[in-house]
Amino acid sequence: MNIQALLSEKVSQALTAAGAPADSEAQIRQSAKAQFGDYQANGVMAVAKKLGMPPRQLAEKVVQLLALEGIAEKTEIAGPGFINIFLDKQWVASQVENALNAPKLGLTPVEPQTIVIDYSAPNVAKEMHVGHLRSTIIGDAAARTLEFLGHNVIRANHVGDWGTQFGMLIAYLEKMQNENASEMDLSDLEAFYREAKKHYDDDADFAERARGYVVKLQGGDEYCRQMWRKLVDITMTQNQINYERLNVTLTKQDVMGESLYNSMLPGIVADLKAKGLAVESEGATVVFLDEYKNKEGEPMGVIIQKKDGGYLYTTTDIACAKYRYETLNADRVLYYIDSRQHQHLMQAWTIVRKAGYVPDSVSLEHHMFGMMLGKDGKPFKTRAGGTIKLSELLDEAYDRALKLIAEKNPQMESDELSALAKVVSIGAIKYADLSKSRTTDYVFDWDNMLAFEGNTAPYMQYAYTRVASIFKRAGIQEDSLTQPITLSDEREFALATRLLQFEETITSVAREGTPHVMCSYLYDLAGLFSGFYEHCPILNAESDDVRQSRLRLALLTAKTLKQGLDTLGIETVEKM
């Protein structure tokens, strides 16, 4: 049930009947205060201006024509022409019944789209670090959300698996006479990488050999390809451990690295030349874009092939967008890449559109995000200024959560303690990020994220456990609750209305790629349940009818909290 969509349709119909253009927007919003009703229609003023009539006069006409019988208890006109809508309690109760009995909490079925989500994208032969965290967990929340709604989601892990570094690594492995690369773990690879780079910088013969291996690798040399595949496999095996620890849904099957598009690059350069979009400039192949200007105010040149014949990231990104439309049949492509890459992506997509590789009907969206900062406001690093490995961050989160939970539950068995610490620690790291607007930088703070108060994962996980425990404590089975829901107390009504706003929330998250909206909703819902729980006795209600009604409200709250947290990739527990 999407109340906002229902009211938008009703108010739009009334606006049209009142003489407004057919495309007039109702602008339905959830009311900030109960005195203004449950929803407000704010579109009357803009429409009245177009029609050249007083807004309040149009609002009165719209209210007369509004068909909200059985949905709204009353409507009121406020100020210059706002329409406040007060929902009918019986109608809200009936919609809660529907949500409880229907699959997926009563969500309206969507028209399924094929949506490609580009996220995580670590580099081969390097261990994942905290810089990969935001893309990985925000992108995964988007994938889970869209999949839950019923879309066909294709996860694309655009790993950095191509380039000169592989020539260096293969050359160094050969130098060390270590062809048994399959037994290396990633920490060895990182050490190899550092040594290979040192040799590359210091030894001209080595550098020449490394460059030769790059050419051989690009030419399909079997020995080089075999070594390259080992490096990729070792890296992705290690990354998979991190993904599973993070409760992220990416698998090895989702890897679509840069190398996937190699065979497309010569054809794309030739095609862009043939279309007159790319030209030779100082030996390189360049696309000049009028949409972007250089410092002299001239069209900016985007290089797609270097003088030496090598290709650039832009060329790969053009091929990648083309592939996602032509081969994956994408209706929508979401890129979870940090904000520093914005201009680069926009330039690639401008070329893609001009070349006709992806039609305007297919949405290409950069869901950019800010940086992860330490308490000092600088990029989050080790005390020595180094990059923090993701595995080390997860280890520290687990240790901190274990200590905290052990202090609160000294009698808890060690196995249970360990399992709970895993769920709480991973939830804390993910929720701390997901609860902030992705477009802003955010400060990483252990104390805040592991707190059991405020908008944190431990608080939300506890909120779910608290609701679920009501049923466990009383030994109540869901199917034993047969009495209808009644909403006689204002707190019952407020909780019920907020429960019905789950679809509006998840629809917004799916449209904008903003999981913090879901976090805010769940935190608000937990707060409303807390007020309801304290003031409306559930197990000790005045009658069995009221008891069952309140238990059913509690049941939908538990289901909504659990499902909402699941779309964020955060697990719940039955006991805390």
From Swiss-Prot:
<comment type="subunit">
    <text>Monomer.</text>
</comment>
<feature type="short sequence motif" description="'HIGH' region">
    <location>
        <begin position="122"/>
        <end position="132"/>
    </location>
</feature>
<dbReference type="GO" id="GO:0006420">
    <property type="term" value="P:arginyl-tRNA aminoacylation"/>
</dbReference>
<dbReference type="GO" id="GO:0005524">
    <property type="term" value="F:ATP binding"/>
</dbReference>
<dbReference type="InterPro" id="IPR035684">
    <property type="entry name" value="ArgRS_core"/>
</dbReference>
<keyword id="KW-0030">Aminoacyl-tRNA synthetase</keyword>
<protein>
    <recommendedName>
        <fullName>Arginine--tRNA ligase</fullName>
        <ecNumber>6.1.1.19</ecNumber>
    </recommendedName>
</protein>
<dbReference type="Pfam" id="PF05746">
    <property type="entry name" value="DALR_1"/>
</dbReference>
<dbReference type="InterPro" id="IPR005148">
    <property type="entry name" value="Arg-tRNA-synth_N"/>
</dbReference>
<keyword id="KW-0547">Nucleotide-binding</keyword>
<dbReference type="InterPro" id="IPR008909">
    <property type="entry name" value="DALR_anticod-bd"/>
</dbReference>
<dbReference type="InterPro" id="IPR001412">
    <property type="entry name" value="aa-tRNA-synth_I_CS"/>
</dbReference>
<keyword id="KW-0067">ATP-binding</keyword>
<dbReference type="InterPro" id="IPR014729">
    <property type="entry name" value="Rossmann-like_a/b/a_fold"/>
</dbReference>
<comment type="similarity">
    <text>Belongs to the class-I aminoacyl-tRNA synthetase family.</text>
</comment>
<keyword id="KW-0648">Protein biosynthesis</keyword>
<dbReference type="GO" id="GO:0005737">
    <property type="term" value="C:cytoplasm"/>
</dbReference>
<dbReference type="Pfam" id="PF03485">
    <property type="entry name" value="Arg_tRNA_synt_N"/>
</dbReference>
<dbReference type="GO" id="GO:0004814">
    <property type="term" value="F:arginine-tRNA ligase activity"/>
</dbReference>
<keyword id="KW-0436">Ligase</keyword>
<dbReference type="InterPro" id="IPR036695">
    <property type="entry name" value="Arg-tRNA-synth_N_sf"/>
</dbReference>
<keyword id="KW-0963">Cytoplasm</keyword>
<dbReference type="InterPro" id="IPR001278">
    <property type="entry name" value="Arg-tRNA-ligase"/>
</dbReference>
<dbReference type="InterPro" id="IPR009080">
    <property type="entry name" value="tRNAsynth_Ia_anticodon-bd"/>
</dbReference>
<dbReference type="Pfam" id="PF00750">
    <property type="entry name" value="tRNA-synt_1d"/>
</dbReference>
